[in-house]
Design a protein with these regions (language model features):
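Conserved class I S-adenosyl-L-methionine
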Residues: 1-23
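Short catalytic/ligand-binding loop motif for oxyanion handling, primarily in non-cytosolic enzymes
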Residues: 6-11, 63-69, 129-132
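C-terminal alpha-helical "lid/dimerization" subdomain adjacent to the S-adenosyl-L-methionine
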Residues: 15-38
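Short alpha-helix
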Residues: 32-59
Length: 171
């Protein structure tokens, strides 16, 4: 898992997670010797150049440290789902707008992969297994009876997993 250098949170003014300054990633990391993050294109190329021909990319929101929605190009969440996410930012952030309010236009323009805040990526030199989850939601912050993780698979079957014993009744 890694942050997306072009994640919407960074365009919104969030400080870069490793350097604690806003805009440094989208400006190309001008300071030498600092931690860096990568775009989708950069990650895919980096792994392909190392012989990892098979790749599966997941997009994570709000980010990989606090995942609530994990999705793929095969199953994009609707804007309503994303507009309800709680986003948090580290100190030194200079927020220019409400990130959640932009997702409708981002999804309607099919650029959600470019602006995803984080990535999970599976890479392999051999073909990856088929029928993996294409969409996952986790409600760890909900009240105990509603803490359910939902997985939607490539073949569109749905699996619900209770995260708390009290949530079993809601499956």
């Amino acid at each position: 898992a890694i942050e997306n250098r072009f994640g919407l949170k960074y365009w919104s003014g969030a400080a870069e997670d490793h350097i604690c300054k806003p805009f440094v990633g989208i400006e190309g990391y001008k300071e030498k010797g600092t931690a860096v993050t990568f775009s989708k294109y950069d990650l895919k190329k980096l792994f392909a150049d190392e012989g990892f021909e098979y790749q599966r990319l997941y997009y994570v929101l709000p980010d990989y440290k606090f995942p609530v929605v994990i999705y793929t190009d095969k199953y994009v969440p609707n804007a309503s789902t994303l507009s309800k996410l709680a986003f948090s930012y580290i100190d030194n952030s200079i927020l220019l707008w409400n990130e959640a309010k932009l997702y409708k236009d981002i999804i309607n323009n099919n650029v959600q992969d470019f602006f995803a805040n984080s990535f999970l990526i599976e890479v392999s030199r051999v073909k990856l297994e088929n029928n993996q989850p294409v969409y996952i939601t986790a409600k760890a912050e909900a009240r105990k009876p509603y803490r359910v993780t939902t997985l939607i698979y490539d073949d569109r079957h749905i699996e619900k997993i209770p995260v708390h014993e009290a949530a079993i009744a809601h499956i």
